[in-house]
Amino acid sequence: MVADVLLTHFNQLFCLNDPGHPLTGQEMKKATIVEDGYIAIKDGLIVALGSGEPDAELVGPQTIMRSYKGKIATPGIIDCHTHLVYGGSREHEFAKKLAGVSYLDILAQGGGILSTVRATRSASFDNLYQKSKRLLDYMLLHGVTTVEAKSGYGLDWETEKRQLDVVAALEKDHPIDLVSTFMAAHAIPEEYKGNPKAYLDVIIKDMLPVVKEENLAEFCDIFCEKNVFTADESRYLLSKAKEMGFKLRIHADEIASIGGVDVAAELSAVSAEHLMMITNDDIAKLIGAGVIGNLLPATTFSLMEDTYAPARKMIDAGMAITLSTDSNPGSCPTANMQFVMQLGCFMLRLTPIEVLNAVTINAAYSVNRQERVGSLTVGKEADIAIFDAPNIDYPFYFFATNLIHQVYKKGQLTVDRGRIL
């Protein structure tokens, strides 16, 4: 077979054999590091991988050849938890955070999510599209090729649908692949304050059926937290969403442990998000139910909290984990997955291999894209992040710098030395 593109002489390729399930426990610690590696691409797919000189049959007169001495290649990074589409920003809350005002106190004062809801409701489709596109561009420049994007800053049908429509438009227009999550249950809207059940009924009866019919989202999510939605309320919504055919995610155990993990395990959610306050018993429940733990260390960093999710304990117990940005305008205003990956080492005490497995193959399982992306594997799409680094450890050791040299998306050179092509 003659390749369309042949990438050669990488110092290292980060490869693994996808075992057919998210990596857990000792599997998280393993990878195949190919020295002097090459990747052959045809029709957007990886058709060969190896070490040394590629087979002569891969090279034809039209084959594009590129050498990457001094560079490493990983699968394209996957950010599987973002609140991508929103209006406004919340830097005016930063001084309050520095003064020690808590996230929930800011929310109670009408700030936080509700502040962004007001800004998003007043934002046009074009405003939201352009703002979200800029964030996606930034992510792409940092090696991200697939992104999960939630609604949740509308809390009414008109605005929630506008957010989902923006995600759908960007999925068509932008190189990054987007996976849509419907999260109208991100907070209790002011017009339903004191009556969250009535709001959930509106979501179930009026919103979810349309989202499903128009294929606007693949997943449904809810914020199960003190002063937001209870475990029973979360169970009520997610069970109805599951009946309609949605895959499930749940924000749980971020600030307090109030039963969100039980809901995730009972309903076989694909992932439970945050988990800073998770208990040993709850870790066992998620393992038993096969729920992926999606950890968001940049949120803990941004909130200036001391308690990070117990990633080391989770992995050692046999749990599958991922890492994501939680990109949003309030509790985590960043879109930099390289920073999150570095926090995975510095604050969660994971190894570079564990982090790379978390943000590639496990993240692919978290967004139901494991058949297409998540590993440098023959037959999968050629989503490749190329780092200006001599080895796999270097992008973690040399932190706070964008080390992306190039990005390939479906076999196309998409980012070249800081420019989107």
Curated annotation (Swiss-Prot):
* E.C. numbers: 3.5.2.7
Q: Cellular component per GO?
A: cytoplasm
**Residues involved in N-formimidoyl-L-glutamate binding:** 153, 328, 330
Residues annotated as binding Zn(2+): 81, 83, 251, 326
- Listed InterPro entries: Amidohydro-rel, HutI, Metal-dep_hydrolase_composite, Metal_Hydrolase
Chief subcellular location equals cytoplasm
**Would you indicate the residue range of the signal peptide?**
none
Location in the cell: Cytoplasm
Record's keyword terms, sorted: Cytoplasm, Histidine metabolism, Hydrolase, Iron, Metal-binding, Zinc
Q: Which PANTHER family match?
A: IMIDAZOLONEPROPIONASE (PTHR42752), IMIDAZOLONEPROPIONASE-RELATED (PTHR42752:SF1)
Q: Which NCBIfam families match?
A: hutI
Name of the protein this chain belongs to: Imidazolonepropionase
